[in-house]
Amino acid sequence: TYSGNPIACAAALGTLDTYKEEGLLTRGEELAPYWEDALHSLKGEPNVIDIRNIGLIGAIELAPIPGSPTKRAFSAFVKAFERGALIRTTGDIIALSPPLIITKGQINE
């Protein structure tokens, strides 16, 4: 089994050390309001039904295309991928969770 594997535990501890040394969790807290404002600025855009978030995790619900559920979100996925961004879709919802090292400039993009 992989439970309690010493190598995996060492990697996890190293990751936690990096989070602490680089202040990544604090950085996430500091960027959360900026992220929220940027995300919610999309309200009123065509086909946007709802926007929700907590911290640096967000979701944009899109109006489904009649007779083609999930197509609108999948099209957004493809366009984002072509531009170098990775998003996740569930139905007609786009899920976003940027890395903790994201900059305000990158959020603006």
Model-assigned labels for residue ranges:
Residues T1-E109:
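Conserved N-terminal phosphate-binding loop of PLP-dependent enzymes in the Aspartate aminotransferase
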